[in-house]
Amino acid sequence: VISASLSQADAESLYGTAADPFEVERVGLTREWIIQLPFDSDRYRLNQIDTAQWMVIAQSEDGIVHAVRSSDGNAPEVNGPLPGTLLWSAPLGLPKAPLHSAGIDRDLVTINRDMNTFGIDSRTGSIFWKRRLPSPPSAGSLPVGDWVYVPLWDKTVYRLPVNPYRRPSNSNSEKDTDSKTSSSSKLSLDPVRIKSHGFIEQQPSRFGEGVLWCTDYGRLTVIEPAEEGWERHEFFLHDNPNGPVAVRDKVIFAATEKGELTRFEDATRGLRLTWRFLLETSLHPNMPRPQIMLHNETLLVSLGEEGIAAHNASNGERLWKTSLQGTFLACIGSHLWCYDIMNRITAIRLIDGQEDAWLCPGPFTIPVTNRSSERIILASPRGLLASLRPRVIGSEQSALQPSTSSSKTSNDTKEETPAESPQPSTEKPEAIKVEKPTPQGKDEPFNFFGK
């Protein structure tokens, strides 16, 4: 899907790059969509890109926030926007203002700008509310359930209601008397400042129905709803974290500057340490922050100059290690795609860590880490966005697409042909499948990388 008209010069500049459909097909992927974001790319640049299962939020330096419909592999909504559609562009704040990660929920997108936090309708792009912050934000805000959490520079977390004009749903479920209704509803909509006991430099994460954040000194804090009010659990890493934590449901993975990889789980009395593993590397002050990515039961950890390692997420056992250095992009099928230090988009096999395929990034020099879906999101500083999905062949492709009509027609033919004559010709179409290999060796159905 090409959602914006590209000039001939732009199309020629994509030849041989990661957005070239022929190059993408060669490595077992398909270009799902490509779009040019509408902003003054001669004066400003694209700076911050955040992904979710159903949306990509991109922020440009001129203060405009763009929302693009994305896909998670499921069938698109009926009469809904197709993947790659520009949903809206909303100007917020002044140009060249500091940009933080966007908080993306199904109905609300939260953006920090200067001393304000904006709540934007995710479908229309209209500003639902605007809240003045008591202190500058230190990281991106996050909507979770009925609340929005904003880390502040004064080592607190500002909690706001998602809908400032309606009481939270958990308060409505309580047994309130008429005398308490007016006062409790007023208090439930008031912002609350929560002490974080440390500086928060990474966007908080969703933890079940609650929220999790980590301070720069390694204090993990979880706040989740309880039968009466809220529960707060904390755990000390005894060292500074070496990057953002990874969360799946109520399981936490974190690493420290001294090179310790840990896993925590939610327990009745707080967080419980499941296992810890000592890595071969430690973080120096000038080194970039490593990454953690979880794919099924494989935990991927970047080791800086030491490369990339994979661990068993259940017990922490080391699976493999490669010397390739790179920034994680996405996990697609049986491969990890990363932007390596040689300015290549490289695929690594998750089973053994071997490099398997390469793409030239071309103008897409902004690494975008996508943990929400099996999609590679390409981004250029001048506002060109593209999505690469796994290539699906034959019957697998029809399974992903809404092909009820085609399945009905195939069933009808099977029912009609025996009525005419029980010829073996009715079995031939089943024997001749679409995914049979063509004479070309590079397009075999399950040999995606042409080897």
Which residue stretches match the model-derived regions?
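Short loop/turn segments that connect beta-strands within beta-propeller blades
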Residues: 70-73, 121-124, 162-165, 224-228, ...
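Beta-propeller domains
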Residues: 58-83
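A structural motif specific to WD40 beta-propellers
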Residues: 32, 76-77, 87, 126-129, ...
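Long, low-complexity, intrinsically disordered segments
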Residues: 421-451
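Blade/loop signatures of beta-propeller domains
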Residues: 6-34, 167-169, 174, 180
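Repeat-blade elements of multi-bladed beta-propeller folds
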Residues: 6, 10-13, 42-64, 90-118, ...
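A short helix->beta-strand "capping" segment at the edge of beta-propeller domains
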Residues: 16-45, 82-87, 91, 186-191
